[in-house]
């Protein structure tokens, strides 16, 4: 319908040092300020309040650095509020039972690979049912195993017409020992080949593969990436 959001979910995958926290903060603030909703609720979710606080602190710094945003926003220790609309942006630690009472306009779930299950994400999606143009953003680095909620989401999201996948990382066909692959998995200018080479020499390869190639380690019997995920991410 006209004026309705094409995507209700987004899955973003970036390697370590890729700027995930900054991206999450910028997206959350963009939604709160550029799509004003009366008493809109905007949350950052992670496994702990400390982890979610990393993203929130980035958002708070962005607001304080901009004169216009600073003038229209009340900045508290763990909450940003726009008095004119009553909208709030805050940290929400992982607690699926408590989250049942929220009705968010937008949610950023940070480092989803650490989540034990999908209960928090499901609670947030359930709370958005009556929200027009709600958006749930899941952002993460690859997990240590090819199982769990992030792996399952990576399998289902590319097939969902209401979900958008943007996953930057190596594929199973890529040689993880090749610096050219490292560069493609880390296109950010602030990440150098020297930095990656130091990590390659220091870390066990499965750890390097996960953190710096953003690829789930190909161990065990479940070796293949979900069919079509890379094309969906690249497209």
Model-derived regions, located:
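Catalytic P-loop NTPase motifs of RecA-like helicase/translocase cores
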Residues: 18, 99, 115-116, 145-146
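Post-Walker A helix-loop "phosphate-sensing" segment adjacent to the P-loop in P-loop NTPases
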Residues: 31-39
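Walker B catalytic acidic pair
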Residues: 110-111
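Non-catalytic, compositionally simple segments
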Residues: 118-235
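Conserved Walker A/P-loop ATP-binding site and its immediately adjacent core
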Residues: 40-59
